[in-house]
Swiss-Prot record:
<keyword id="KW-0832">Ubl conjugation</keyword>
<dbReference type="InterPro" id="IPR036910">
    <property type="entry name" value="HMG_box_dom_sf"/>
</dbReference>
<keyword id="KW-0131">Cell cycle</keyword>
<dbReference type="InterPro" id="IPR051965">
    <property type="entry name" value="ChromReg_NeuronalGeneExpr"/>
</dbReference>
<feature type="compositionally biased region" description="Low complexity">
    <location>
        <begin position="1"/>
        <end position="22"/>
    </location>
</feature>
<feature type="coiled-coil region">
    <location>
        <begin position="190"/>
        <end position="257"/>
    </location>
</feature>
<keyword id="KW-0805">Transcription regulation</keyword>
<dbReference type="GO" id="GO:0010468">
    <property type="term" value="P:regulation of gene expression"/>
</dbReference>
<keyword id="KW-0156">Chromatin regulator</keyword>
<keyword id="KW-0238">DNA-binding</keyword>
<keyword id="KW-0539">Nucleus</keyword>
<feature type="region of interest" description="Disordered">
    <location>
        <begin position="1"/>
        <end position="71"/>
    </location>
</feature>
<comment type="subunit">
    <text>Component of a BHC histone deacetylase complex that contains HDAC1, HDAC2, HMG20B/BRAF35, KDM1A, RCOR1/CoREST and PHF21A/BHC80. The BHC complex may also contain ZMYM2, ZNF217, ZMYM3, GSE1 and GTF2I. Interacts with the BRCA2 tumor suppressor protein.</text>
</comment>
<dbReference type="GO" id="GO:0006325">
    <property type="term" value="P:chromatin organization"/>
</dbReference>
<feature type="compositionally biased region" description="Basic and acidic residues">
    <location>
        <begin position="31"/>
        <end position="52"/>
    </location>
</feature>
<protein>
    <recommendedName>
        <fullName>SWI/SNF-related matrix-associated actin-dependent regulator of chromatin subfamily E member 1-related</fullName>
    </recommendedName>
</protein>
<keyword id="KW-0597">Phosphoprotein</keyword>
Amino acid sequence: MSHGPKQPGAASAPASGKAPGQHGSFVVAVKQERGEGPRAGEKGSHEEEPVKKRGWPKGKKRKKILPNGPKAPVTGYVRFLNERREQIRTRHPDLPFPEITKMLGAEWSKLQPAEKQRYLDEAEREKQQYMKELRAYQQSEAYKMCAEKIQEKKIKKEDSSSGLMNTLLNGHKGGDCDGFSTFDVPIFTEEFLDQNKAREAELRRLRKMNVAFEEQNAVLQRHTQSMSSARERLEQELALEERRTLALQQQLQAVRQALTASFASLPVPGTGETPTLSTLDFYMARLHGAIERDPAQHEKLIVRIKEILAQVASEHL
C-alpha cells in the first residue's frame, strides 16, 4: 500500500522528465532542419557552379597585349582542338559548341601517348619560335614606345586611386596602348572562329589574286622585253635602209650628171635637142625613139651611145 502512491509519482516523474527531453530534442531537430536548409541550398549552388562557369569566365577577355607583335603560341591541346573541331562539326552539324568541346576533351584524354606527343612537340616548336620572334620584337622601337606608354599610365593609376576606382566602376580598362581595344577578342568562341575563317579565306583569296597578278606581270614583262628588242632591231634596220637609200640617191645623182655631161655632144636627130639634169629623161626617150625609127641610118650614133654608157657604168656603177 505504501508503494501505491509512489507509483503515480514515479510514473509522473519520468513522464515529466521525459517531456523536457523530447521538447529539447524537437528544438534541436528544428534547428538542424533550419541549419541544413541553407547547407542544402549551398550544395545546390555548388552543383550548379560548373554549369555557370563553362568556357572563359564572364567579364574576362584574353588580350593581345602586343600590337603588331608575334602571334602567341597555343598549347598542344588547343592545336588538337583546332584540328579536330571542323571534322566533328561536319560530322555533327547540329551539335552545340560546348558539346563539341566536351567530345574533343574526351577524345584527347583517350588519345595514344605517341599521337598526343606529336601535338605537344608541335606546340613546343611553335613556342620556341614565338620566344625568338618575341625577343626580336622587344628590341623594336614600336615595343619600346608602347612599354613607355603603359608605364606612364600605370604610374598615373597608382597616384590616383579614386580615378582607378571610377575607371573600374565605369567598365573602362586602363594600361593599354592607343588602339589596344581592337585586340581584346574573346578566343575559342563561335564568333572568333567564324571571324578567323573569314579572314583566312580572304587572305587565301588575296594571295591567289596576288600570284595571278604576278604571273600576268611576268608575262607582260616578257612581252615588253620582246617588243623592245623588236623595236630596236627595226630601228637599226631602218637606219641601215636610210643610209642605203641616201647612198643610192647620191649614186643616181652622180650617174645623171655624168649622162647629162656625156650626151651634151649628141643632139637628138631631127630636133637638135641636148639634155639637162631636169630634161634628161625626156631627152633619152626622144633619142631612143629616133634610133628605133631608122636604126640603119643611126649606126654611128648607136656606137657612140654604147661607148658613153660603158664609160659611165665603169666610173659610177
